Amino acid sequence: MAKEKFERTKPHVNVGTIGHVDHGKTTLTAAIATVLSAKFGGEAKKYDEIDAAPEEKARGITINTAHIEYETANRHYAHVDCPGHADYVKNMITGAAQMDGAILVCSAADGPMPQTREHILLARQVGVPYIIVFLNKCDMVDDAELLELVEMEVRELLSKYDFPGDDTPIIKGSAKLALEGDKGELGEVAIMNLADALDTYIPTPERAVDGAFLMPVEDVFSISGRGTVVTGRVERGVIKVGEEIEIVGIKATAKTTCTGVEMFRKLLDQGQAGDNVGILLRGTKREDVERGQVLAKPGSITPHTHFTAEVYVLSKDEGGRHTPFFNNYRPQFYFRTTDVTGSIELPKDKEMVMPGDNVSITVKLIAPIAMEEGLRFAIREGGRTVGAGVVAKIIE
């Protein structure tokens, strides 16, 4: 049973465990995989297999992440779990593992701790849209009032960071009991309750192809007699021949029309998310379009220069800076396909940022970039990556 292939017909959702060190994230991950694989097929994973998370690289940053998958009655889930706090910070900021929702694991015996708060804040900053709470180690708390108090604290903390604390599902259980095969309320029943909350509380994410058309410009060619061809990989949506599109970023936004879509030298009537295409533009000159701009559905995305961001600064060991940086530091910000210079304003209470830190900053770019909250970028100095970031809030 355990080795059966997953049914890919079910909708796919990405989730992950977050929360304070030793509150039981990895144990819960193992418990979910074990209980659900017995019910719906798939592979059970042992604690040690998940805890020995392999190294991977995202934007030049080394991150340890364990990926497991499981099924519920309605869905297929990909689930990430990180061994260390630093791995969570890097993972969430680089978007190496984009989450449609997070499972916040909080020990009922300890209540919310510093990393509980920090992970909720990070989830807010990087745009994790939904959080479900698993109140773990409930077998260690006999006092019902104490449980209620911890639940209230967690709800208040979620509300403080703009999550709907009062409406958030909170499941009480014990990952350890569930993993040991306990069939009771705190064991298997709690895991099934969690699976149910995942299915009902996190909406099915929009597929890339259903979004508004967007394609980062990688290259521009002039073809005599045909006009200007822009190449790139369609990030989301669909582009059909004859549709109006906007060229956004760097310069003033311009309108144009798609008169052809080519893929592998063949003419198509449309291109869609994931396709590497050449798009022929009517009446657009070669010099009107450049790398770093995007082609987009009219009105769907706007250019901005001023925003707040959550960034992770590479440590010296990761090939980052050897020294801290200060207010008004001016690196390049690499968005999609190009670098734009910008200046960094640090929070009032931060005099400097050390390599290996994560920090909230405000950025002013010298040229506008087509931007949305949640957009990832790299921070570079002369072509060398020194940090990674994500747009938290657009100012103008």
Swiss-Prot record:
Residues 136-139 are annotated as: G4. Its main location: cytoplasm. GO terms for molecular function: GTP binding; GTPase activity; guanosine tetraphosphate binding; translation elongation factor activity. Pfam families: GTP_EFTU, GTP_EFTU_D2, GTP_EFTU_D3. The keyword Cell division does not apply. It catalyses: GTP + H2O = GDP + phosphate + H(+). It comes from the Bacteria. Mg(2+) binds at residue 26. PROSITE patterns: G_TR_1, G_TR_2. Residues 174-176 are annotated as: G5. Its EC number is 3.6.5.3. Keywords: Cytoplasm, Elongation factor, GTP-binding, Hydrolase, Magnesium, Metal-binding, Nucleotide-binding, Protein biosynthesis. Belongs to the TRAFAC class translation factor GTPase superfamily. Classic translation factor GTPase family. EF-Tu/EF-1A subfamily. This is Elongation factor Tu. It comes from Burkholderia mallei (strain ATCC 23344). The lineage of its organism: Bacteria, Pseudomonadati, Pseudomonadota, Betaproteobacteria, Burkholderiales.
